[in-house]
């Protein structure tokens, strides 16, 4: 018995309505992220859903969430969320995770992703790492943003940090011994300093040599992570601006190492590993408000 056009459309509608949200839990040097494929689901990812998914006791748990959506001028569009349900413009680790999944799906070695930072080109390197063109850094005081006009190369704070934006704010302190810094004690105060109206990521970096730095992070909204792609980029960029680093830098975080390249003019390139941990579908209980 054949199904009429109206009944067929109704069946398709109901199929799409109840199509589950699939996800992949990814590990990017200890910076765990979740990639959700929302292209074939009628269940939108909202701030409340992102917060429930980010709960490490009752949800999936992540540092950042990347939601994959259809896009007309790129292979896909990405939206990012923090654990607390707040949106963010960029996440280097989650971008690598999404790029890895999409390149495996399409059996390709490069893709282009649309984000609030613009179009990001991602490639798989010969050793399996993911390279992401993260766009150019921004140095204007209003781009970071800061509360008032000033030189972002040396901020008027104890320790003379530098600031920049990679689509999110970064404040970098250069220290002699990164292990001597009590990040948990001073990180929250620096993150919420009045100079940063949207808060800031805070970096503490020890220059090992011109090609190698040791980095520890207090992440905006997130505390102390094992690693961060955008923070690695912001740190390397500020070190290059200060004349402390060459244009290709190995960034060593607690969870592993990435490479950052910046020629001082154009886009910043982030290169590093990412691995799938497990996959699944979002439970109905999480989808309900």
Q: Can you describe what each PLM-predicted range is?
A:
Residues 11-127, 172-289:
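A glycine-rich beta-to-alpha transition motif near the start of alpha/beta enzyme domains, typified by
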Residues 123, 133, 145, 156, ...:
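Generic structural detector for well-ordered beta-strands
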Residues 128-135:
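Short, solvent-exposed secondary-structure boundary/capping segments
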Residues 133, 161-165, 214:
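Active-site-proximal beta-strand elements of phosphoester/diester hydrolases
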Residues 136-137, 257:
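Short, charged beta-turn/beta-strand-edge "cap" motif at the junction between a beta-strand
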Residues 138-160:
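Active-site glycine-rich loop that binds ribose-phosphate moieties when present
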Residues 153-180:
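Internal active-site segments that recognize and position negatively charged phosphoryl groups
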């Amino acid at each position: 018995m054949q199904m009429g056009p109206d009944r067929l459309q109704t069946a398709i509608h109901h199929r799409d309505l109840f199509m589950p949200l699939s996800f992949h839990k990814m590990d990017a040097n200890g910076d765990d992220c979740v990639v959700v494929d929302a292209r074939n689901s009628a269940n939108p990812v909202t701030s409340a859903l992102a917060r429930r998914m980010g709960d490490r006791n009752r949800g999936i748990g992540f540092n950042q969430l990347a939601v994959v959506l259809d896009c007309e001028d790129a292979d896909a569009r990405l939206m990012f969320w923090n654990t607390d349900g707040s949106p963010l413009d960029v996440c280097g680790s989650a971008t690598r995770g999404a790029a890895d999944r999409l390149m495996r799906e399409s059996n390709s070695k490069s893709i282009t992703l649309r984000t609030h930072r613009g179009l990001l080109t991602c490639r798989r390197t010969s050793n399996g790492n993911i390279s992401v063109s993260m766009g150019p850094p921004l140095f204007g005081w209003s781009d970071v943003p800061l509360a008032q006009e000033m030189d972002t190369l040396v901020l008027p704070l104890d320790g003379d940090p530098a600031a920049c934006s990679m689509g999110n704010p970064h404040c970098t302190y250069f220290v002699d011994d990164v292990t001597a810094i009590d990040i948990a004690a001073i990180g929250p105060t620096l993150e919420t300093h009045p100079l940063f109206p949207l808060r800031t990521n805070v970096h503490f970096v020890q220059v090992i040599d011109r090609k190698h730095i040791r980095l520890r992070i207090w992440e905006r909204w997130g505390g102390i992570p094992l690693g961060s792609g955008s923070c690695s980029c912001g740190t390397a960029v500020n070190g290059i601006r200060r004349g402390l680093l060459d244009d290709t830098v190995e960034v060593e975080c607690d969870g592993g190492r990435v490479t950052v390249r910046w020629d001082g003019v154009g886009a910043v390139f982030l290169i590093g590993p990412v691995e799938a941990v497990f996959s699944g579908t979002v439970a109905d209980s999480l989808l309900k408000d």
